[in-house]
Amino acid sequence: MSPEIRDIEYEILALSRHITAAVGRSKRDGDRLDESAYTLLNLLEVGGPMSIGDLQRILGLDTSTLNRQTSAVLKNGLAERRGDESGGLARRFHLTRTGRERLEADRQASCAALANTLSEWSAQEREELMRTLRALNAAIEQRYPQPWPRR
């Protein structure tokens, strides 16, 4: 294993830990979505209505975990499940107005925290980070096909 790969792996571990800690802090700071709800609502916003099968292909979660997560967003009124408007048999999850509002509030808080963290970075450095993260995600998705919706 090359030293560069080992260092990259360690930095990804550290980043993952920082994100997990930030999610914990944000939940303690108020009425914030948990990580699974935030992820599901983002997917529905970007990808449009999705079936449980669509979500399973994207997230790679087992059925029981995904059912538990989708049940929670339904119970909290963040999404609703409707019949397929194109006539298919699958029922699809749709964002509700409440879900959109909560998602936007959480996104604003998340982006404000990120902007604060990167406040001393130049626009060029932020752009470089975005391109590098996008390239890393694309490489992962090419190797392990899970069709993550894009804006």
Model-derived segments and their meaning:
Residues M1-P3, A22-V23, Q124-R151:
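C-terminal regulatory/oligomerization modules of transcriptional regulators
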Residues M1-Y38, R151:
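N-terminal leader segment of winged-helix/HTH proteins
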Residues R17, N42-V46, R107, R134:
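Short, locally clustered residues in the helix-turn-helix/winged-helix DNA-binding domain
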Residues R17-T20, G24, E104, Q108, ...:
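Charged/polar positions within long, soluble alpha-helices
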Residues A21-T65, T70, K75-N76, R92:
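N-terminal helix-turn-helix DNA-binding core of bacterial DNA-binding proteins
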Residues S71-R131:
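Charged, amphipathic alpha-helical coiled-coil/dimerization segments
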